[in-house]
Amino acid sequence: MSRMESPLEVPLSGGNVSQVVLVADTVRRVPSRASGTIQRLLNYPTIAALPWIPDHFGFDVEGRECIQFVQGAVHHAEPDWLWNEHILLQVACKLREWHDATIGFDRTDTIWNLLPRSPDEVICHNDFAPYNLVFEEEQIVGLIDFDTCAPGPRIWDIAYAAYKIVPLVPDDSVPYETVPTENSSRLNETELRRRLELFLKCYAGQDKNLLYSVEHTITTASERLLVLADWTAAAARNTMNSELPVHESMYRQHSNWLKTFNNKS
């Protein structure tokens, strides 16, 4: 029996748009409106050449997407080592690799699940976060969940990745509207800025044109979270998922906190 016809299916957690199952060494998922575009994207030569990007095998006999399963672990629980500096640098480097590999991808007749943003510099992953990264022994070996990919500016992706991995969030023990102090973030102000600057410098590498400022990144992250909050609110109305309004509220609170942080700085 071929891989494309294997009947044994194991449910997997995750997936932004559709249910996901494991069949042999492939991931199968009900296609979204953007699946044809995502297939083209993952098969784009410079993207397919990245060893940590899964292969897209097309669609199985049931019409589901068939994507290579990446061996490793996805850490939704955020282990302590996730905040080590070498992880921060890896995320920045991988994001830069992804962006550079998407340059030149033909947008003709493409369909995306999210609206493209201007300027159209690269194809943003739009959810480049620890829960979509596959690790082996604290090394990134894979990126998953491409449902939210869409054209946009580099900083749009950079800001969200920084929000997740620096992280640019207040501590859960204090009100989000509190003016940032050394006790209102997982990091004190100096350390937060240091980690964000390190992330931005690693992403830019030798290209000074890609070195974004801390202030611009935080401002963009705040805007990004408001857009995400609006998207989450719409999804909540459409799905009646009781958890989504909680997430929407969190994104709005975090966005306001980032505005306050920038104003204080």
Predicted regions mapped to residue ranges:
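Actinobacteria-biased recognition of intrinsically disordered, low-complexity terminal regions
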Residues: M1-G14, T260-K264
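ATP-binding pocket architecture of kinase catalytic cores
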Residues: L8-H125, A129, E136-Q139
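Short, polar/flexible loop-turn hinges at active-site or ligand-entry regions and domain interfaces
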Residues: A77-W81, A150-G152, V169-V174
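Alpha-helix capping at helix-to-loop junctions
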Residues: E97-T108, P130-V134, C149, K164-D171, ...
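Catalytic activation segment of kinase domains across protein kinase-like and atypical kinase folds
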Residues: V122, A129-L168
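Active-site activation/catalytic loop segments of kinase-like enzymes and analogous catalytic loops
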Residues: I158-G205, R224-N238
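Eukaryotic Ser/Thr/Pro-rich intrinsically disordered, low-complexity regulatory regions
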Residues: S213-T217, A221
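ATP/Mg2+ or Mg2+-diphosphate-binding catalytic cores
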Residues: L226-S265
